[in-house]
Amino acid sequence: MKLFTPVLLAGSLVGYQALAQPINDDPTGPQPRLPTESLLIKTTAGKEYNFTVELPTTPQEQATGEMFRTSIPADQGMLFVWKSPQVSEMWMKNCPVPEDMVFIGAGGKIVAIAENTVPYSLSTISSGVPVQATLELQGGITAADDINVGDQVIAKALSGR
């Protein structure tokens, strides 16, 4: 037991140290491609659009987001799912291409859209109301596809929210 306690304590401290690693809020390059899933947007006009979205789940992945990526394909994006509904506040630091930010409320309904956000801007882009997720898409795609507030977003990551 005398050896077990120090070994257990040392193991706990190593685990705690790994959890306590600071978030690098000033990365210098794009993060590797993250795990993906399919996402469907159903418009109130009856149109359907399919996207493949990356899922940043760790604080570091969420902080880095689309930074330094020089393009976002029209059928791809990034879905930030929050642990609980919150006012989503984003920015375009180190993002060289415009994005459409789609703010998703309860039941997967789109509650706000910020179109063609300004590359590299440090201005806050806010959902204005608590949302369960934020979807980043290629700038201009929501207007081109006539995606609007009130449309439905369906994705496994949003299930049960």
Feature names for model-found ranges:
Residues 21-161:
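Compact, glycine-rich, soluble single-domain proteins
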Residues 2-9:
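Sec-dependent signal peptide recognition
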Residues 15-17:
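N-terminal signal peptide c-region/cleavage motif recognized by signal peptidases
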